């Protein structure tokens, strides 16, 4: 009798909704993880090395690979030529999909490794020393700025992309200090420009 009351009642009258979940698969679910990126295979397309993931999946699990690639086939027309299909793939590679990291690019060292030291006049008889080019030797500018401030007991700041300003005239001592602290910097790569106007 209780079951007939629930069946006849309005949905707004029921305080407890009886929802029966639909069972589409076996529980617990078995998730297939990629051997290249270690993510579930559905997420491989968002990684920067999609081609490697697809090759691994095609080699190890061809049936799963066929299911995943079926979603991409309807984009192409049935009467396409092979040359047209490859140009479409190239366009897809050029465009970065939202949410993906894209291809990781390596930095190219095109700038010559050279450190320049200059003495810049300020008001009256005061000077600042400008050191440029430490970043070309992969030296952290913030660490170098702290080191110069402690070594010379003065103020120092990182002002530009590759520039440190030290308050005071330290052009004579700074070459030896740089070579002492960072031995990868040789004497030929340090250039003293002398007194330069700002």
UniProtKB/Swiss-Prot annotation:
SUPFAM superfamilies: eIF1-like. Pfam families: DENR_N, SUI1. InterPro entries: DENR/SUI1_TIF, DENR_C, DENR_eukaryotes, DENR_N, SUI1, SUI1_dom_sf. It comes from the Eukaryota. Residues 77-87 have a biased composition (Polar residues). One of its GO terms (molecular function) is mRNA binding. Keywords: Initiation factor, Protein biosynthesis. Residues 95-110 have a biased composition (Basic residues). Belongs to the DENR family. This is Density-regulated protein. It comes from Xenopus laevis (African clawed frog). The gene is denr.
């Amino acid at each position: 009798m209780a079951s007939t009351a629930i069946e006849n009642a309005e949905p707004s009258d029921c305080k407890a909704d009886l929802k029966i979940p639909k069972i589409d698969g076996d529980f617990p679910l078995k998730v297939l993880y990629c051997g290249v990126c270690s993510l579930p295979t559905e997420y491989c397309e968002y990684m920067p090395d999609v081609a490697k993931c697809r090759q691994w999946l095609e080699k190890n699990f061809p049936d799963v690979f066929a299911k995943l690639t079926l979603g991409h086939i309807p984009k192409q027309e049935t009467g396409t030529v092979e040359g047209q299909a490859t140009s479409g793939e190239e366009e897809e590679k050029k465009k970065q999909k939202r949410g993906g990291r894209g291809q990781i690019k390596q930095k190219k060292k095109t700038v010559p490794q050279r450190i320049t030291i200059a003495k810049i006049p300020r008001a009256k008889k005061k000077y600042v020393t400008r050191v440029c080019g430490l970043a070309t030797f992969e030296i952290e500018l913030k660490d170098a700025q702290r080191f110069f401030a402690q070594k010379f007991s003065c103020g120092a700041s990182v002002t530009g992309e590759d520039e440190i300003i030290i308050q005071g005239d330290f052009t004579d001592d700074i070459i030896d200090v740089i070579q002492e602290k960072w031995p990868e910097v040789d004497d030929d790569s340090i250039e003293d420009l002398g007194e330069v106007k700002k």
